[in-house]
């Protein structure tokens, strides 16, 4: 395991998550993408939360986007389905048990809910405890404007 990268902020987190994942994967690294909150489900996302299925996918493909399904009621309210992140105990096990196959875990951490900025609070951003690097994404479209609630 080289790094566990958590990406927080607004205006481009998902794009950055996928760009980093593609670049690391292209360079021959094993990559797992997940979230600590909610994230849109992409094609070929594994929602099984099954250690062996995730392990096999990472070993076979060198890449896996994984999480668990949000309840059907919440999914139906979205135009595109969203997922929650992997349970921390499962993520811990994948990191611990796959040191040769899993090089990078890239986590879309807490977001700003379509605002350009969100102040940190006691319980946010939601950052995975084994994170080695945090990247803060800030949209510049509101540069120069006052921050308010």
Residue ranges and their predicted role:
Residues 38-39, 71, 111-113, 140-143:
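Conserved nucleotide-binding/hydrolysis micro-motifs of P-loop NTPases
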Residues 7-8, 31-35, 65-68, 104-109, ...:
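General beta-strand structural signal in soluble alpha/beta enzymes
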Residues 69-119:
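Phosphate-binding/switch loop-helix module in NTP-utilizing enzymes
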Residues 21-22, 55, 91-96, 121-127:
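A generic local secondary-structure boundary/capping motif
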Residues 21-73, 77, 81:
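N-terminal phosphate/diphosphate-binding loop that engages ATP/GTP or pyrophosphate donors
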Residues 1-27:
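Walker A (P-loop) phosphate-binding motif
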Residues 116-121, 145-149:
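A short secondary-structure junction signal
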Residues 121-143:
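Inter-motif core of Ras-like GTPase G domains
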């Amino acid at each position: 395991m080289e790094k566990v990268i958590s990406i927080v902020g607004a205006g481009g987190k998902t794009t950055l998550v996928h760009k980093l994942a593609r670049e690391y994967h292209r360079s021959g690294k094993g990559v797992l993408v997940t979230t600590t909150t909610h994230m849109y489900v992409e094609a070929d996302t594994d929602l099984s939360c099954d250690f062996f299925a995730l392990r096999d996918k990472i070993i076979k493909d060198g890449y896996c986007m994984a999480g668990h399904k949000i309840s059907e009621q919440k999914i139906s309210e979205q135009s595109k389905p969203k997922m929650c992140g992997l349970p921390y105990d499962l993520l811990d096990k994948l990191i611990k048990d796959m040191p040769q196959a899993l090089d990078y875990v890239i986590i879309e951490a807490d977001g700003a809910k379509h605002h350009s900025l969100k102040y940190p609070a006691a319980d946010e951003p939601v950052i995975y405890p084994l994170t080695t690097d945090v990247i803060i994404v800030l949209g510049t479209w509101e540069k120069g404007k006052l921050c308010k609630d």
